[in-house]
Amino acid sequence: AILDQSCKGIFDRELFKKLDRVCDDCYNLYRKPYVAIDCRRGCYQNLVFRQCIQDLQLMDDLDEYANAVQV
């Protein structure tokens, strides 16, 4: 996993793993290195992360992920 330096502060490891997993799964879906990097950019607060949520059919969990990246 690539830790984006924009993620600062104290983190819940389980929460971080869950967010990171979205980016890993999205990378596995598309097999493009920039997907994994861009997905994590801005501590997961970006359009690529949101698109990954949609592409992985996780829209039912969108509110949970949105709250997580605002912590």
From Swiss-Prot:
Broad class of where this protein is predominantly found: secreted
One CC-aspect GO term: extracellular region
Pfam families in the cross-refs: Crust_neurohorm
InterPro entries hit by this protein: Crust_neurhormone_CS, Crust_neurohorm, Crust_neurohorm_sf, Hyperglycemic, Hyperglycemic1
Modified residues (Valine amide): 71
Entry's localization field: Secreted
Tissues where the protein occurs: Produced by the medulla terminalis X-organ in the eyestalks and transported to the sinus gland where they are stored and released.
Protein name in UniProt: Crustacean hyperglycemic hormone isoform 1
Organism: Macrobrachium rosenbergii (Giant fresh water prawn)
Lineage, top ranks: Eukaryota, Metazoa, Ecdysozoa, Arthropoda, Crustacea
